[in-house]
Amino acid sequence: TTWSRGLGDVYKRQNKGGCNLSFAGLKTAILRISSTLKSKQEKYDLAASFQKTIEEILEVKTQVAFDEFEKTIGKKERAFVIAGGVAANIGIRKKLIKVCKKNNFRPIFPEPKLCGDNAAMIALVGLEKYKVKKFDKLDLAASPRLPLDQKAKFLKGAGVRL
């Protein structure tokens, strides 16, 4: 199809090395492409391509992480925890189990019913902040990169603080 190249470009950008990743470019590509599609079948195909692209990116990034683990930690007992909303996705689970088996890691998943919503994790952060009387003003801007530790040093491009 004419739009699959756009997803391939996002895939190539994500797999330039390292463990950092962002799906912002993929989300933008999907939104741009979906606005041009007319038939339901094209939309179904795009959704399937979106799923497959995410699975492949996570497979590659997990392999990179396992390789880094091997270099820095060695051959200790290996367990890989997959949690959050991503762990509820059957296709992603299968890909990550495959990578775990290939690298002798034991995959650990919560039950699917515990994976579907990040609200519990957000509530836990709220509870922890409440316990130490750390309150934000009501005009706090929403940010997908808002760190839990506001004092941490920002790492440009990584979307994380250490």
Walk through the language-model features, giving the residues of each.
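Single conserved hydrophobic/aromatic residue that forms the stacking wall/gate
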Residues: 1-11
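A contiguous, well-structured pocket-lining segment that forms one wall/lid of small-molecule binding clefts
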Residues: 9-80, 87-105, 130-133, 150-162
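Active-site metal-binding loops of divalent metal-dependent hydrolases
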Residues: 84-86, 112
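Glycine-rich phosphate-binding/hydrolytic loop that grips phosphoryl groups
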Residues: 110-150
